[in-house]
Amino acid sequence: MESADNGPLIGLLPHQWFNNASVAGKLGAAYDSVRGQIKLLAASQFKTQYRYQGFVPHWPGVKEGPRLDELADLLKADVRKRRELIPGRENNDNWRTSAYWQGKGLMRTTQLASVAEQQGDLEARDQLLGLAKERVEWWFSGQNRSYFHYDKGLGTLSGFPDEFFAVEQINDHHFHYGYWIRAAAEIALRDPAWAAKDKWGGMVDMLVADIATTRRGGSDFPFLRNFDPYEGHSWANGLGGVGEYGELGNNQESSSEAINAWAGLILWGEVSGNRELRDLGVYLYTTEIEAINHYWFDVHGQVFAPEYKHVEASMLFGGKYSHNTWWTDEPRQIKGINLLPIGTFATHLGRDPKYVLRNLGTLKGDTELWLSRGKSYSEVPKDTWHDVFAKYLALADPAAALSQWDRYGSVELGETRTHTLHWMLSLNEMGTPDFGVTADTPLYQVFKRAGGRKTYLAFNASKAPVGVRFSDGQVLTAAPGMLTRTRP
């Protein structure tokens, strides 16, 4: 028998069919999968459309409040110890000298520089930016034991020394290089000449191209190395899944570090005048956030099987989801690896405040269960990543986060106490993110206090004033090369 050709059936994943008006009323049969229900669409193509929420490179200075002296004291202390912010360039054991740890150090250094700048300490800002430039140039020069190497045969840029099989298996490049791209963009905001293509910007462009070139069919780098357009998120293993886990397909653990990378593309594209790259970054950033909400956090309750009792998946494989990490089963790190780094680009984590509280609410029980199995905090502090969780809570309840935070608590190696306190004080002053308002510029954010008062932010990377219109009717003129705030 031969049937008529009625065209293909496309299987849509939850992030493709959920709230997708273009396929409403057109979906047919569905079947269960590890990603939730796959629904069939009789068509040769379909589209997804998500709302880009925006972010700004940094938040304005905090000028009022009871803890300004504490913020100033922490800033002085962190600046005084600035040489400790980035791990040493070289040591006999290669301890934390890889591109990953160096990148985390660079990003926290430039974040601290932004806080210093916004709080009015330009001398501290310049000291920190000078330190960041020094380390970037050390690696980019190719004249030292720490360097990047382009392998023409493999079509990849690798950092030496490496960790996490970043060279052997081409793992985690978007995680590692995202920190570098973001830090370089922060430097470029203040020193465009440093970031020129014939200076250090050319190397930044290579880092970008390695993880997400906009060119198809190139002989140097593959198009979108890490990102899977159909799955809507990135994969971290460069070989597509190997060893004992190979049958489960590829995997990704730290979805939040992927978001950091795509935010870096947006910012670098905007600062360098590369609109094509900026727009690609917007697509990657916005799409992966939707996938994270479905497959890592299951905020809509459509993915996790009933027997899966955790509130999040910390590791996503092609064929399973898992509540663990590659290096530990300690609950705080299991939860935190999909939160860090928390910067201005990460406010999407607070889109569902009830989920934030529910997520954090499971930490106590998870920890008690872990300890009951004979585990102990012999290798890490009991308050590991205390600052990460405080910043996450602040997206839902800034006052509670500020009251619970201990300035003497542990510090994650991509953070500083100054940046953490500035984050919480900012949210206490401005309110939580208002995701109902958009703007006609890529670098913007809106916050809303409980009483209804809003704060509008816009960053203008160009050399001329730009008029910005927000979807609720508010307008402002963004001054060139800086952050502009209005609070009607």
Which residue ranges define each predicted feature?
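Charged, terminal alpha-helix-loop-beta segments
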Residues: 211
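Active-site rim elements
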Residues: 247-252
